[in-house]
């Protein structure tokens, strides 16, 4: 399925010295976002920093949202994950895309100019109408069982 998403380049280096975000393969779900920083930066252990991507998007469809997700290699190998765990970009947001990076490791990490720091996935969104009830219609096997209710493994 092809869809159009409006974007603005906020950093003039994007598409020139810094590669434009793109899908790595035909089957990639996530578009890699790059660090549009002036100079390489160190993220100290336990530190969280906001990193600009050099662009803004406007989805312009309440049936869509963008999710910013960590890159698996950065998280697994270096402990670099998103400070907010998942970034949610609403369809009516038009501001700069920023990535909150958190170094959860015990080693400092050097972010280089133009480095792939997160990935963006466009997802469908439903906005259901909620109906207040006194009791739910059909009881389920799980019922009100919450955290850990279905077993330990």
Curated annotation (Swiss-Prot):
Pathway(s) annotated for this protein in UniProt? Pyrimidine metabolism; dUMP biosynthesis; dUMP from dCTP (dUTP route): step 2/2
Q: Which residues form a coiled coil?
A: none
Its needed co-factors are: Mg(2+)
GO BP annotations, alphabetical order? dUMP biosynthetic process; dUTP catabolic process
Q: Indicate which residues the UniProt annotation says bind substrate.
A: 71-73, 84, 88-90, 98
Quote the catalytic activity from the record: dUTP + H2O = dUMP + diphosphate + H(+)
The Enzyme Commission number assigned here is 3.6.1.23
Stored Gene3D superfamilies: 2.70.40.10
Mind listing the GO molecular function terms for this protein?
A: dUTP diphosphatase activity; magnesium ion binding
- One matching Pfam family, short form? dUTPase
Keyword tags: Hydrolase, Magnesium, Metal-binding, Nucleotide metabolism
PANTHER family given in the database record: DEOXYURIDINE 5'-TRIPHOSPHATE NUCLEOTIDOHYDROLASE
Q: Which family does it belong to?
A: Belongs to the dUTPase family.
| Stated role | This enzyme is involved in nucleotide metabolism: it produces dUMP, the immediate precursor of thymidine nucleotides and it decreases the intracellular concentration of dUTP so that uracil cannot be incorporated into DNA.
Q: What is this protein called?
A: Deoxyuridine 5'-triphosphate nucleotidohydrolase
Provenance organism: Hydrogenovibrio crunogenus (strain DSM 25203 / XCL-2) (Thiomicrospira crunogena)
**Its encoding gene is what?**
dut
